[in-house]
Structure formats: structure tokens, C-alpha cells
Curated annotation (Swiss-Prot):
It is found in: Cell membrane. It comes from Adiantum capillus-veneris. InterPro entries: CASP/CASPL, CASP_dom. It holds the Pfam family CASP_dom. Signal peptide: none annotated. It is a multi-pass membrane protein. Homodimer and heterodimers. This is CASP-like protein 2U1. Keywords: Cell membrane, Membrane, Transmembrane, Transmembrane helix. Belongs to the Casparian strip membrane proteins (CASP) family. Residues 33-58, 118-145 are extracellular.
Amino acid sequence: MASRKQGAREGLWSMGVRLLTTLLCITSLILLLKAKQTVRRALGLGYIAQTVKYSDTSGFIYLVYINILVAAYGLIVFVSLIPSALGKSCSGKCSRWTIFVLDQVFAYVLLSAVSAATEVLYLADKGMSKTQWEALCPTYGFFCHMVSASVAIGSVAVVLLAVLSVSSAQSLFHNFYTRALYTTKMRHSSLT
């Protein structure tokens, strides 16, 4: 009975972290989609309007799609874990293996997307003097702040996915392989 309560507690904890990760990905996505700024610049006797938005660079587009993918995955797993958290059913070895592998995959994919967006943001903030690429953030401050917030929130989601990966690994290997390891140790100790 105590192990069932502990399992339910672990399931609720996992569901809470998954829901938080999903909400963080959605928040990061919304901030990135709203990252758009138009600036009027003087050009001779007139003005020209220049607009910068997330879709101008492939790094930000990649982060948008990965945020959608990770949020959908998190929501699907969250909904699929509700019956086991309520004690209605117990997830089997196959579903735990699937969650374990997909947690790893999505953690690394989100990490790559956040890394790509961070590099683009760094170039927008600092520029690159060797190639005479000017920094955009002094001119497009609102855009850079929105993208910075999106990348920071995405980084927190990466950390939470890494924690979920460790948690799903612990759940998988502890629940299904401890008994086999114990039996193997008992056999080896009885031989000596």
C-alpha cells in the first residue's frame, strides 16, 4: 500500500512537471510569435520602415516548431498519465520505455532549438565586426527583449525536460529491473 501511494505521488509529481514544461513551451512560443518590431529610419529626405520578426531567421523558426512539438508531446503524455495517477490503471513496461526514450529525444531536440536561437540572439545583440554585421538590439530593443524572454523560458523547459528524463529513467529501471538485479545478486552470493 505504501509503495502504491509513493507511486501515485511520483506520478502526480511527474504530471505536474510535464504540465509546467508544456506551459513553458507554450509561453516561449507565444513570446516568439509576438516578437516583431517596426522602426522608421531616416533615408535621405524621407523615412523607410524596417520590420524585424522571428520568421526572418531559421533559428527562431526552428524554435517555434520545436516548442509546438514539445508542448504537444507534453500534453499527450500528461493526458495519458491521468488514469495511472488516479489509480485506475498501471502503465506497463512498454509505455514507460516509450516515455523514457521520447523524454530523452525531446530534451535534446529542444536543447538544440534553444541553442540555435541563442546563437542568433547573440549575433543580434553583439553583431559581428569581422563581417560588418551590425548589432540589431540597440535599434530593435522590444524584439530582442521578447526573443530573450522566449529563449530564457525555453532554457528552463530544457532543464525540466532533463529532470523528467532522469525521473522517467529512475521510474523505469527502479520498478522493472530492481527485482531482477536483486535475484541475480542473490544467485551470485549463494555461489560463493
